[in-house]
Amino acid sequence: MKLKSRFTSIIGVITLFFSQTVTAESDVVISVDEGVSMAQPIAVVPFKANGGVPADVGQIIADDLRNSGKFTPVERSKLPAQPGSAAEVNSQQWTDIGVDSVVVGQVTPTGGGYNVAYQLVDTLSNPATVLAQGAFNVPAAQIRQGAHTVSDQVFEKITQIRGAFRTKIAYVVQRGVSSYELRVSDYDGYNAFTVVKSKEPLMSPEWSPDGSRLAYVTFENKKAQVVVHDLRSGSRRVVAALRGHNGAPAFSPDGSRIAFASNQDGELDIYVVGANGGKPSKLTANAGNNTEPSWSPDGSTIYFTSDRAGSPQVYRMGLSGGGASPMGGSGSYNAKVSSDGKNLIMIAGDKVVKRDLASGGTEVLSSTFLDESPSISPNGIMVIYSSTKGTSKVLQLVSADGRFKANLPGAGGQFKFPAWSPYLTK
């Protein structure tokens, strides 16, 4: 594969970031391909609804926990009981079916919204012990965010890992030959809205570290330029418009700079520019094409794809430039670093692959076809990417341990370039 041809072809705080009207519209909704047989069993009892509720809060929580790959929720038809509070939980009923943790709760309409209350119950003690509980009000339009909040708290209490169910994804939808949309939705595909529409290609969205901006590639001026789009105001700024093509933007961890690729000197090289624009500085200067930069969490290192050795391969180099070390093996590209800096997620052999940066061990995560553009959840637990299904590009989800796989089927378009947001809540 030639890199140059690849480059040219190719609740609360949350609502403050987005000026567009958010509805329950969804382009894509998670559909399970492969569940997890060895994950921790958990029971999420249907939440008691005190009045009409527009969403099944308990099911949303169960789906979130399942999607992480860490839990296997008990099917509702196999629940031995449906308690509404910890006081109603009979520990023996649950331990008899191998369940140590039970989530119960209620949803009650309030003025203009709902009160969501939950308890996480440990059934290993008798009577059952409450491990975590909470109650909070959410606007009616944010009922799914209320469910995701419960999921985050339950997930963190059990795993000691911060939950990422209130995050979002950005992606590009292509319909026909001259209709492109940059869309943003909840991580599970719900509450989608359009950021920008164009008759020219849109590519490679990337989030700023605070989740308030998206950098992406647009051809609206008949050339590939990198723009930064403020999601609160809707304003846009061109930050990279060198001669030739500009693409593959990546925000630095502090949000002050953007690394990108440009072929202004003939071959592709990595440049760094201020997040508000300015004069770019050139980072690579080797023979061959260099593209797809990705920052290490501490901002000291850039991972990128280069064909300097004859075929695409992931390399690593210090931000000051200089020598680069091969990291991914021949045929690897599209690398992203996990937020803890321990793993590299990339494409190799057209599959999503995880590489342990300490040991060098690799693991194939996906089992789909012609995979591209992996993006990691901020807690490192899940990976979203695009793949080819028939004649369509679709979004796929896989847990970072490879045990849970799902697709997000979309209708009426090609779904490409997914990008997972950072945490959007404190």
Curated annotation (Swiss-Prot):
Q: Name one GO biological process term.
A: protein import
Report the source organism: Actinobacillus pleuropneumoniae serotype 3 (strain JL03)
Similarity section: Belongs to the TolB family.
- Tell me the first and last residues of the signal peptide: 1-24
Question: What name is this protein filed under?
Answer: Tol-Pal system protein TolB
Q: Is the keyword Secreted assigned to this protein?
A: no
Q: How does it assemble?
A: The Tol-Pal system is composed of five core proteins: the inner membrane proteins TolA, TolQ and TolR, the periplasmic protein TolB and the outer membrane protein Pal. They form a network linking the inner and outer membranes and the peptidoglycan layer.
Give an example GO cellular component term for this record. Answer: periplasmic space
Q: Does the keyword Cytoplasm apply?
A: no
Matching entries from InterPro entries are given as: 6-blade_b-propeller_TolB-like, PD40, Tol-Pal_TolB, TolB_N
> Its principal location?
periplasm
- Alphabetized NCBIfam families for the sequence: propeller_TolB
* UniProt superkingdom: Bacteria
